[in-house]
């Protein structure tokens, strides 16, 4: 009798993706983050669904409805904090996943990488709109500041902003449409993730050496299913430590004040996972220039495959490139710190230097380092 796992039309797809999938025998824990992102997405969709059952997207009642969820709904507080901190875990996994791709040269799978960049942008858009929904001070002013950036677009800017707002300021229409988009986008992300996986399985996974591993493959189950379960346990442990012990650690106290258009908070800043891009935006004195730098700080990832000059795929055996990579990581941490600081000396100049460094490392230093390493290979 043939195995149903291998013959049933639906089971066959699952089998070929998660059970009998040939995987390299030497992939490290850095390859766990793809499955962890899937878990994060499922968790966010489920908690978000239960929150949407009790949330009202009206400016008069949005803040109160979130308070109601935390106070009156059975386990509403844990669902709300799992959703809020789940977003943070999502972005930690995303940054690790992208970092892994950069370090080990996974960006040479062009289709997979480009879908990944689109996924990153979509997730950032979703998270931004979700932050607006509780309708606290930082929600309102964050929405105002970030949507207002579109007014920097020549000629159509102002019309575009008012079209997105649905009026002349961030108001009821804006909140309602942001809720609608925030609800639908995770399902689009899920669909894109499947396409991401489809393209990945066309080529098979990369591995730490960057050398083709066709000669040495092992089945995904049980080896990597067990490994992924370990990663999932650690992810859930970290999330629950955050949720149950310090649920507001990563939030902003200003968001516990209902939105007030007449009172601007002293420091408007987004959630921690956007601070690096926010720092780059603020570093440029010109509005349009800042917006372009902000967009390019993410879209530059799409250029990385074109900037690959090395004869080797992975950075595993390239010490100079490794140095550049870790300097880039340190630079991103610096930008994240600067994004949360007020706009005053010495933070302004540090932010400007870190922003220049960010683009300089990716566009100049990494290709140069690769070329030097290529020449060192010929050195006798």
From Swiss-Prot:
Q: Where in the cell is it found?
A: Mitochondrion inner membrane
Any idea which GO molecular function terms this record carries? Answer: metal ion binding; ubiquinol-cytochrome-c reductase activity
Q: Which keywords does this chain's UniProt record carry?
A: Electron transport, Heme, Iron, Membrane, Metal-binding, Mitochondrion, Mitochondrion inner membrane, Respiratory chain, Transmembrane, Transmembrane helix, Transport, Ubiquinone
Topology with regard to the membrane?
A: Multi-pass membrane protein
How many cofactors are bound and how?
Binds 2 heme b groups non-covalently.
| Chief location | mitochondrion
User: Record keywords: Iron included?
Assistant: yes
CDD domains referenced in this protein's UniProt entry, alphabetically: cytochrome_b_C, Cytochrome_b_N
Quote the record's binding site residues for heme b b566.
97, 196
Q: Which GO terms fall under biological process for this protein? A: mitochondrial electron transport, ubiquinol to cytochrome c
Among the entry's GO cellular component annotations, what is one? respiratory chain complex III
Please give the start and end residues of each transmembrane region.
Answer: 33-53, 77-98, 113-133, 178-198, 226-246, 288-308, 320-340, 347-367
Cofactor or coenzyme needed: heme b
For this protein, the record's InterPro entries field holds:
Cyt_b/b6_C, Cyt_b/b6_C_sf, Cyt_b/b6_N, Cytb/b6-like_sf, Cytochrome_b, Cytochrome_b_C_euk/bac, Cytochrome_b_N_euk/bac, Di-haem_cyt_TM
Q: Does the keyword Membrane apply?
A: yes
The residues that hold heme b b562 are 83, 182
Q: Where does a ubiquinone bind?
A: 201
Give coiled-coil spans as residue ranges.
none
Superkingdom of this protein's organism: Eukaryota
Q: How does it assemble?
A: The cytochrome bc1 complex contains 11 subunits: 3 respiratory subunits (MT-CYB, CYC1 and UQCRFS1), 2 core proteins (UQCRC1 and UQCRC2) and 6 low-molecular weight proteins (UQCRH/QCR6, UQCRB/QCR7, UQCRQ/QCR8, UQCR10/QCR9, UQCR11/QCR10 and a cleavage product of UQCRFS1). This cytochrome bc1 complex then forms a dimer.
Other notes: Heme 1 (or BL or b562) is low-potential and absorbs at about 562 nm, and heme 2 (or BH or b566) is high-potential and absorbs at about 566 nm.
Q: Which PANTHER family match?
A: CYTOCHROME B
| Role noted for this protein | Component of the ubiquinol-cytochrome c reductase complex (complex III or cytochrome b-c1 complex) that is part of the mitochondrial respiratory chain. The b-c1 complex mediates electron transfer from ubiquinol to cytochrome c. Contributes to the generation of a proton gradient across the mitochondrial membrane that is then used for ATP synthesis.
The family annotation for this protein states: Belongs to the cytochrome b family.
Q: What is this protein called?
A: Cytochrome b
Q: Which gene encodes it?
A: MT-CYB
